[in-house]
Amino acid sequence: AASPLYEQPLLVKEAQTVNAATFADGQQMGKTLTLPVHWNKATAKPLLGNKVNEAVLNNGVRGSLKQTDFEWCSWGSSDRISFTVDLLQKEKMNTLTIGCITNYGMGVHKPKSIRVAVSDDNATYRDINELEYTPEEIFREGTFIEDLSIDMRGTVARYVRVTTEGAGECPADHVRPGQESRVCFDELIIE
């Protein structure tokens, strides 16, 4: 291969597609990895609280249909989840989108509600908008990814807090009746 050998982290500062492969003795070993990196107002911004599992929420990489691909963030309990991103400066926001996977067989479903609040000082928050889902919308069969979008109404703020309420236990007619459903998010996108 005539490409340079990368021995340091590859810095990406805008949307682009990274293609990478492993070589030994000039021969490509395995397939080429194609990794689309998306960029938005939340990408690479600090997530407050330093929870290791939440680092994938704004790394610019979307998850696949396998919730085990290390791009999905999940929590030990999905009763109530809350995370805050610091945009580092006041930004105008029109839409907040969060990727959510449903894997019916594993009891992974979207939450009952998603609420977004904003702040200029990380002390006083004001609610902006909320999404709510019925059990019929939550406990759908199949494995699929949904982008759940919230109208931010042109709000200008520095801090954005997302709070979700879990869907609770899987219903009696579910393949996992009585098991607490889990939530998995892949990417927080603020436009």
Role assignments for model-derived ranges:
Residues 50-54, 131-132, 177-179:
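Short intrinsically disordered coil segments
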Residues 66-129, 144-191:
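Aromatic, loop-rich ligand-recognition surfaces of beta-strand-rich domains
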Residues 56-59, 95, 138, 150:
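Compositionally biased, low-complexity repeat tracts
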Residues 1-82:
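Short, compositionally stereotyped local motifs that mark structural "simplifiers"
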Residues 127-138:
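Solvent-exposed serine/threonine-rich low-complexity stretches and specific carbohydrate-binding patches
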Residues 139-143:
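Short glycine-/Asp-/Thr-/Trp-enriched loop segments that recur within the blades
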